[in-house]
């Protein structure tokens, strides 16, 4: 029965690909935009003999699509809405349990009490006329020694909204498992990785691998305790399409000529900047009033005082590569965007834009907070800098010849 279900899923995805190719005149995918997220934050309060106290702080984000994207891809919109509804229902049930647990913790250990925390966030990974891929991030902080977090990849057909099975992209799961193990041991040489091969092969053959479809390859995610200790954190393994062409199949292997790929700060992004299968590793962090871009082992520091970094890799048709790094000005509620051009090892400062991907609407009783996702460098929304408590103004832009914004 399991094999029959997998075969059925593969056949359905093959049909999805046929529809996608019929819907697009050219075989190569084109980047699409129009994705955003809305963030809701809430503090749940309670009262006991010691007074009023905070039970739980909850922050929840869900992916949204704009009017144009809804009209162009109604089935994708429906699938995303269903994913959101399912997650929001699960989160509501979980937060109710966490409130009960927090109240019990307050009663049994008042001297050690602290509010519980819950966060659910989303981050786009790829968006084009062939496939849409994004990450879900979940964090729970309770009465334990440390909180727990989890990253989960979601992969969908852009045309039909159907889930993308790994079989549609990978020829041989066992060979893929070997490549993942090889990559993990190369990227994390100090990790003992007990019984790594057995664990990864089992995950691959039982469809338990956690992955995203990136423009240049597949990235696999291993959360704390999955294959290593909690202290080692999230581990990732990226296999590039042109690095191992023997492993992959299907039209998803071809990236859009121009694309933008958001990625989490403090975690490395592996890609191929020249689209030739050669690995480029990028990471971004802030320290001592500077933003640091580490490119293929070379640390490039830029004296721009930003925090809470939200980086995006931008690849243009002519091969130019940029980072747009959105961040909060230290000590202020406004956000700006640092623009950096990437070479093979060095990064060059281009500009600091008085713009951010954060969009705010100042309405009672609280400010509504949205974030634009940059996935199509030839057309996207970005907001003029604005304090958090005010309504920000949105401009429609594209990436210009020098890496800065063009308007219209």
Q: Where are these predicted regions, by residue range?
A:
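Positively charged n-region of N-terminal signal peptides that target proteins for export
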Residues: 1-4
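Bacterial N-terminal signal peptides
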Residues: 9-20
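Compositionally biased intrinsically disordered regions enriched in Thr/Gly
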Residues: 25-274, 285-292, 299-317, 333-335, ...
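Hydrophobic beta-strand segments that make up the repeating blades of beta-propeller
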Residues: 281-284, 321-327
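Surface-exposed loop/turn elements that mediate protein-protein interactions on large endomembrane-trafficking
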Residues: 290-304, 338-355, 395-407
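Repeated scaffold domains used in trafficking and secretory/extracellular systems
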Residues: 307-314, 355-371
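Blade-terminus and WD-like Trp-Asp/Gly-His loop motifs, strongest in beta-propeller folds
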Residues: 316-317, 373-375
């Amino acid at each position: 029965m399991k094999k029959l279900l997998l075969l059925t899923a593969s056949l359905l995805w093959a049909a999805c690909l046929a529809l996608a190719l019929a819907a697009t005149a050219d075989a190569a995918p084109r980047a699409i935009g129009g994705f955003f997220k809305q963030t809701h934050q809430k503090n749940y309060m309670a009262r006991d003999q010691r007074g009023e106290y905070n039970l739980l702080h909850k922050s929840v984000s869900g992916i949204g699509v704009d009017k144009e994207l809804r009209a162009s891809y109604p089935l994708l919109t429906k699938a995303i809405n269903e994913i959101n509804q399912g997650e929001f229902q699960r989160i509501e049930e979980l937060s109710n349990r966490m409130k009960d647990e927090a109240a019990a913790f307050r009663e049994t250990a008042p001297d050690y009490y602290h509010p519980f925390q819950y966060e659910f966030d989303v981050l786009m990974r790829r968006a084009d006329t062939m496939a849409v891929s994004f990450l879900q991030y979940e964090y729970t902080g309770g009465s334990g020694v440390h909180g727990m977090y989890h990253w989960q990849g979601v992969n969908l057909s852009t045309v039909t909204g159907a889930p993308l099975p790994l079989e549609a992209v990978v020829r041989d799961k066992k060979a893929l498992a070997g490549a993942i193990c090889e990559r993990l041991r190369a990227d994390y040489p100090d990790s003992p990785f007990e019984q790594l091969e057995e664990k990864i092969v089992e995950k691959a053959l039982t469809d338990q691998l956690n992955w995203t479809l990136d423009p240049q390859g597949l990235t696999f995610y291993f959360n704390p305790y999955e294959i290593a200790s909690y202290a080692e954190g999230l581990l990732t393994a990226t296999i590039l399409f042109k690095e191992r062409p023997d492993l992959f199949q299907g039209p998803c292997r071809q990236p859009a000529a121009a694309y933008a790929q958001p990625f989490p700060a403090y975690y490395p992004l592996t890609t191929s900047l020249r689209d030739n299968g050669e690995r480029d590793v990028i990471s971004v962090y802030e320290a001592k009033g500077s933003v640091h871009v580490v490119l293929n082992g070379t640390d490039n520091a830029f004296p721009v005082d930003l925090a809470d970094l939200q980086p995006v890799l931008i690849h243009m048709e002519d091969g130019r590569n940029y980072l747009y790094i959105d961040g909060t000005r230290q000590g202020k509620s406004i956000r700006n965007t640092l623009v950096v051009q990437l070479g093979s090892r060095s990064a060059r400062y281009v500009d600091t834009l008085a713009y951010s991907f954060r969009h705010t609407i100042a309405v009672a009783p609280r400010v509504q907070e949205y974030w634009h996702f940059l996935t199509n460098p030839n057309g996207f929304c970005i907001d003029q800098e604005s304090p958090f408590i005010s309504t920000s103004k949105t401009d429609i832009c594209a990436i210009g010849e020098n890496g800065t914004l063009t308007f219209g």
